[in-house]
């Protein structure tokens, strides 16, 4: 039998409630939770000796249960004569001090300041069915009466689903009256499923509006939220922020409900925040593997990503997480990323902190009392040391951090906080610095902290392994030098390069150190990045390495002049990112691949030179357009896709006759590598130039 109204308008009609209680008979209808679910909030805000008015009491057992645990002075009112008669008959003998009155709550007959608490369980929700003028006037009369019959210091305690229009009305009304406003989420309410809505469970909230004595001229407003797991309420700056916080709790309840019902939600992620500061502490991704055959022990697992490794493909990309989940062999895997700026004591502490929350995301059909394993790499939480934080006027907030990789080597990273899952620049640290960091970690095991200035090497440049390229797209770009004529002679002849986009400086620095006759112009629009590269990534200028602080568009345009430019660069490299995340192409900015600008690039490239472009484009239509534009200016175009990333490296040349077949290209790459691998010169043994070019295709 469907006892919840099909239309919200029915909530406000006397006829509906008369019919409702006649159908229900003497069976209690515990709308919005039972006493056991609400008692924590009720006992927190109502004292046993206080005089309590319950408005819209219905046939709920709530008043009876409060009476039985010591709350004697309770008056119940309802608009339904049927229910008042029922409740009087039920309680006349067993609860003689409790009274039931048929009364309209918009026109109550009690004297002013008669009660210390007005308790409302779903009544405001039943009345405020829409925002039409007639409805709002009725609600205004109801809330005005609540304020009239309450004493100063008294509380209006309203149990509600906190729909947006209801929260707005209640908070707005009482905050204008100078009352303190608190919203308290009822513990475990997200597990309650309304009979009429089996597909969704709404969380239940308690509004606690405390009546203050009016202070003429005072504009003080107090808004607080007390989430169920918090020990103390959090003060919020405005009614709007309070509404947002409530909505976040509702959205989380919806998400949990859908995940319990095998709903296909696609990629699901959420942040778990510090209850006191509101700062994100964990980022969770829910990954389902429908192909995994269910068994008792493979329903659900939690994977803790070691600090600093959340940007790796396996943990930071949807496809990588799917691969991780499939290899782990669980129906549902939740990956957990730890945030910089937060302190984590140990894996055990993280597990204890997460256990209750992650169980709300468990899949349907998981056996009760089943142990859920916590997984990780290496068995610890990893190492992340924030070395420096600052803000660039052009790039925004950024952070320099040292992290430990899976081989126990340490890496230094530049990350823009506007896109914190992308490593902007990365360099490997030398082993002596790694050992220092390891000792520091042992010293600070009980409490992690950012490195102090005195902990840093005296000469930051000496801490960087300049022979090692961390970024796969940088390795591919260097391998593209094999397209130049006579690559085995490149160490002996002058080589002019233009690099647009400095970042941490790893790319131009590698060329500078491995090609002793090279002369490099690096163009960087953001002066802060030059400081970062110099202070933290071992970069330095010399007579062969010059940095120009300028917009790459303007710099190349000035060289191209009026179209009569003299070719001056053997190699031009674009490794420049876009600051606009809405474009579908994050590298380079669109202006860098417009045909008019590409003509300028062409004019400063030597006839046998190579133009190398790092392209990061998720919009397939836009990518096709970029490739067509490049092909129109540079007839010979190679593409090398970076596995596991969106990056594609484009090698552009001016003459089709320069084309090299794959065997010839691999042979020249091997010849170049033999030249670079000289005794006494550092070289990463895992870096094989010819491997970088095996998958190159001609467009």
Curated annotation (Swiss-Prot):
InterPro entries: Lys/N-term_MeTrsfase_sf, Methyltransf_25, SAM-dependent_MTases_sf. Changing residue 575 to A: Loss of activity. CDD domains: AdoMet_MTases. GO terms for biological process: methylation. Protein N-terminal methyltransferase activity is inhibited by GTP and GDP. Residues 433-459 are annotated as: Disordered. The keyword Nucleus applies. It catalyses: L-lysyl-[protein] + S-adenosyl-L-methionine = N(6)-methyl-L-lysyl-[protein] + S-adenosyl-L-homocysteine + H(+); N(6)-methyl-L-lysyl-[protein] + S-adenosyl-L-methionine = N(6),N(6)-dimethyl-L-lysyl-[protein] + S-adenosyl-L-homocysteine + H(+); N-terminal glycyl-L-lysyl-L-glutamyl-[protein] + 3 S-adenosyl-L-methionine = N-terminal N,N,N-trimethyl-glycyl-L-lysyl-L-glutamyl-[protein] + 3 S-adenosyl-L-homocysteine + 3 H(+). One of its GO terms (cellular component) is cytosol. Keywords: Acetylation, Cytoplasm, Methyltransferase, Mitochondrion, Multifunctional enzyme, Nucleus, Phosphoprotein, Transferase. Coiled coil: none annotated. The modification Phosphoserine is found at residue 267. Changing residue 551 to A: Decreased activity. One of its GO terms (molecular function) is protein-lysine N-methyltransferase activity. Changing residue 115 to A: Loss of eEF1A lysine methyltransferase activity. Its EC number is 2.1.1.-. It is linked to METTL13 unregulation may be involved in tumorigenesis. High METTL13 expression has been observed in pancreatic and lung cancer tissues, correlates with overexpression of dimethylated elongation factor 1-alpha and is associated with poor clinical outcome. The disease mechanism involves dysregulation of mRNA translation and enhanced protein synthesis to sustain growth of malignant cells. PANTHER family: SAM-DEPENDENT METHYLTRANSFERASE SUPERFAMILY PROTEIN. NCBIfam families: MFS_SpdSyn (NF037959). Dual methyltransferase that catalyzes methylation of elongation factor 1-alpha (EEF1A1 and EEF1A2) at two different positions, and is therefore involved in the regulation of mRNA translation. Via its C-terminus, methylates EEF1A1 and EEF1A2 at the N-terminal residue 'Gly-2'. Via its N-terminus dimethylates EEF1A1 and EEF1A2 at residue 'Lys-55'. Has no activity towards core histones H2A, H2B, H3 and H4. Forms a tripartite complex containing GAB1, METTL13 and SPRY2. Within the complex interacts with GAB1 and SPRY2. Belongs to the methyltransferase superfamily. This is eEF1A lysine and N-terminal methyltransferase. It comes from Homo sapiens. The gene is METTL13.
